[in-house]
Each structure stands twice: as C-alpha cells, then as structure tokens.
C-alpha cells in the first residue's frame, strides 16, 4: 500500500511540474475597423503581428501572419506563437525579454489577403516580460551561512 501511495505521489508531483511551464504564447485582442472607422463585423481578415526590439522601428524578433474572423462586434482574439500561424519568424520563448523594451506592431488586411496596412505599434508592458521568469530556475546562487 505504501508503494502505491508513493508512486501516486510521484506521478502527481511530476504532472504538476509539467503544468508549471510557461506556455510560450501571448494573447492579443483587438477590434478590426475599415479605413473610415467602421467595425468589420463577422469578416475574415488577415493580421501580421510583429514584435520589435528596443524601439517601434527596431529589429524584428518575432513575426507571424494569421487569418482570423471577427465577431458581431468586430472583435478578434489571437494567440501569438500558437499553431495556425504562417510566415513565422522566430519563437515567442526565443525572444530575449531580459534585454530592452519590446514593441508590438499590428498590420491588417481587411480583405483577408496579404496586402497589409500598418495600423500601429505599441510598447509591450509587464505580462509578456514574465516569460523571462521561466529562466529564473537556471540561476546558481551560492548560499553561505556564516
């Protein structure tokens, strides 16, 4: 009985370790509008999302394109780094979040093609930087009790 209990405990702990890993994706949500500001309702659109290093015009550290469908309010949701993207450059876990500011550039083709229009670039804030915390376990610190 003790062996079965020990085995079940080990399996549970190993399973918990697997779930504690960062997923390597970023959520992004927006409302799609046409050139005069009208919401694109229930429409197939294409997005190109780019993460840039240091400045809004900085080096590309990640890029992907996606075909998405807006909802009745023009809202769309994507997960950068998840399956289903095309034209992918880099990986989300491969971005060096520890060095410098990161910016996300959003481009859209309201017709669902590949004629992208740049609709803006914004600096990323705290949450994506938490991906850097996944490497904190790699630190080796001397512990001297003196």
Enumerate the language-model features and the residues they cover.
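Family-positioned intrinsically disordered, low-complexity linker/tail segments enriched in G/S/T/P
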Residues: 3-145
